[in-house]
Amino acid sequence: MARRTRSSRAWHFVLSAARRDTDARAVALAGSSNWGYDSDGQHSDSDSDPEYSSLPPSIPSAVPVTGESFCDCEGQNEATFCNSLHTAHRGKDCRCGEEDEDFDWVWDDLNKSSATLLSCDNRKVSFHMEYSCGTAAIRGTKELGDGQHFWEIKMTSPVYGTDMMVGIGTSDVDLDKYHHTFCSLLGRDEDSWGLSYTGLLHHKGDKTSFSSRFGQGSIIGVHLDTWHGTLTFFKNRKCIGVAATRLQNRRFYPMVCSTAAKSSMKVIRSCASSTSLQYLCCYRLRQLRPNSGDTLEGLPLPPGLKQVLHNKLGWVLSMNCNHWKSPVPPPGTATPGAESLETRPCQRKRCRRS
């Protein structure tokens, strides 16, 4: 394919967007020698920076990420350009990992971008149903206050484009601000944090290498611990790491955003718990038995109690937390309610000696 100037390529795709499928644009971009531009000719700030040093080289933004699925279901780990991307994920839906039936929150039909559509009891959000001309976003129905909050987002479509992100934000985030701009919406300001499918973590307009890429079929877990003030991400139910600290006394909404045409994400788990002794015990049990399929197996507990713990705190008991440690806030910065678990016994002992 002959090389086009930046402006001519941009006009070509803008004028033909309504007539051509997304994969046709992907093929056109794949044949071009200038990578990193979306179909509108705007630069993809997520794909332009060097990737995490241990990861493969950056791929063109129009090519979906493959090989990162939670399961091995057909079609989750491969992408072809002979058919449209819409057709690629229109077949039999994968339900792997979708065991939960009760949800603490779903997507909010009243707080979303115009280029979104909800389905599956408002648990699945589809972005840019025909073609994309910017960035669409949505938030959950519940403001996350005190306690422990955990949710999982499953990528139910090919993952590609300038950005597809999972994260959190305050009520000050304008979800429709960039509906005509291709960008990484979550993390552009101090009111939000976003994990990009490219593996970059965004906050205050800055981005850092945080994880490997994720693609269709990937399950991204998010744990907001308002007791320690931490935000932790999981990929395919394995801990990636702590993304933010000192989040005590703040309230957030779960959020996602996408620039990709015909893309979609689904809430497959959303739960909350108070920071109770019951939670702390389950948390510690999981740390002591990180590789156990059933954390409570073999423990001398009544069957009824085991069932209650599984129902209320199953997400704690099932997570891979080999590297899941809540950081201790620096001295003088933590609030009284956010003291580390490790320092409290020492403080009580000192009081007894005095």
Curated annotation (Swiss-Prot):
One of its GO terms (cellular component) is Cul5-RING ubiquitin ligase complex. This is SPRY domain-containing SOCS box protein 3. Substrate-recognition component of a cullin-5-RING E3 ubiquitin-protein ligase complex (ECS complex, also named CRL5 complex), which mediates the ubiquitination and subsequent proteasomal degradation of target proteins, such as CGAS and SNAI1. The ECS(SPSB3) complex catalyzes 'Lys-48'-linked ubiquitination of nuclear CGAS in cycling cells, leading to its degradation. Recognizes and binds nucleosome-bound CGAS: ubiquitination and degradation of nuclear CGAS during G1 and G2 phases is required to promote low intranuclear CGAS abundance before the next mitotic cycle. Signal peptide: none annotated. It is found in: Nucleus. The gene is Spsb3. Residues 32-59, 328-354 are annotated as: Disordered. It comes from Mus musculus. One of its GO terms (molecular function) is ubiquitin-like ligase-substrate adaptor activity. Residues 85-274 form the B30.2/SPRY domain. Pfam families: SPRY (PF00622). The SOCS box domain mediates the interaction with the Elongin BC complex, an adapter module in different E3 ubiquitin ligase complexes. Belongs to the SPSB family. Keywords: Nucleus, Ubl conjugation pathway. Disulfide bonds: none annotated. PROSITE patterns: B302_SPRY (PS50188), SOCS (PS50225). GO terms for biological process: negative regulation of cGAS/STING signaling pathway; negative regulation of epithelial to mesenchymal transition; proteasome-mediated ubiquitin-dependent protein catabolic process; protein K48-linked ubiquitination. Residues 264-315 form the SOCS box domain. The keyword Nucleus applies.
